Amino acid sequence: MQDISKSIEACAARYGEQATAMRDYLVAGQDAALALDNRGPIEFDASGKLAQHILDAYSKYGFYVFTGVLTEEECEDIEADMVALKASFPVAPDSTVDAEGRPALGSDSLTPHLVWSKPLGDPLGGTQLANGRHQVKMFEPQATADTPTASPFILLGSLRFSDACLRTYAHPELLRVAEAINGEDFAPFNEALFIKEPGIGAAVSWHQDGVTHWDSPDFDENIHGFNFMAQLYGSTAVNGVWVLPGSHKLGKIDIKDLVSSSKSERIEGAVPLVCDRGDVVICNRQALHGSFPNSGFEPRLTVNFGFHKRSSVLRVKGGGIHSDAQVFDDEIIARRSRVLGYAIAARKERFPEETAYEYKPFTKRSLSFVWDDAARADIHDYNRDDLSI
């Protein structure tokens, strides 16, 4: 694990009179996270099923840290793509050109792609954005004078922009985990990159991701799906996501009341997702989670992608957060799933020694995919069909 003692001090120092409380919270949270029994490599039993102790821990806590999933080679591929992506970012939120005057990344998009924030800000908390699910505003520390006025902290539709992220999306062991949790006909959700630069990265206020099924008669702990969070530089108590263990089973939570009872945004019992480079977290979308502004010295780059049970999205009207609200029929789900087919093909080309994942809905329809220029054109604005619930 990374030594983040200097980052803890730097972060706490920005909280003024609450510095000691913040320092204690970060240290205690890190210790509590590492004491949980929900960390280790992906394991399957003799019959090929996901190990029962992983299923049990995921059900108990609402998240599990899979260690050492991405090889150094794969991490380096993502890193190289990130250098190119950042160079192509627009120079400002309302700009269509990059620093070299070229058309900026996503300038021809019909869908949202970059979410911006002021340094160390909380652009979502306490607003009606994302259906108002970010109920409270996080503390926004004062950034230093040399930081930009705004910077991107989320890239949506990331598989279109990064071949390396597309290939990670098709990681065979992760897809086997998705099948174990959501069934062999699991459906895609949404993909994004979360960019938390040191001294700049924005907060994401406490929230639960699900919006559609809270009052469903079929409600269960997995009805809103999950996200995989692959960590390029690791994840810490300072720059990482915090989760309230077990909260995925509690239904819709009154976050304002919880913050009030905790007497601050430092929610009691929450723990950070502590990860090393190449680790991947599976996190239930119903779990209460959020992150503080990155006031430390370590960057975080999270390759985020999620999956649903097909029964959670088929003939269901979407929540309208990641895409326009629409009723998801078989055609829409199939159209949105084609990105997975291209991802499997792209990964097979890059890592031919691996046994590629077999996605049963493709097999049943005798579908095959090739990753080429035509495929690249086919996934332009693919996230218009994000299965957002």
Regions found by a protein language model. Name each.
Residues 205-225:
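Acidic, His- and aromatic-enriched active-site or binding-groove loops in soluble protein domains
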Residues 2-60, 67-206, 212:
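Non-heme Fe(II)-dependent double-stranded beta-helix
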Residues 190-193, 228-230, 303-307:
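A structural signal for short, well-ordered beta-strand segments
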Residues 163-166, 177, 214-218, 230-232, ...:
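Short helix-to-loop capping/linker segments positioned immediately adjacent to catalytic or ligand/cofactor-binding
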Residues 222-226, 233-292, 312:
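Double-stranded beta-helix
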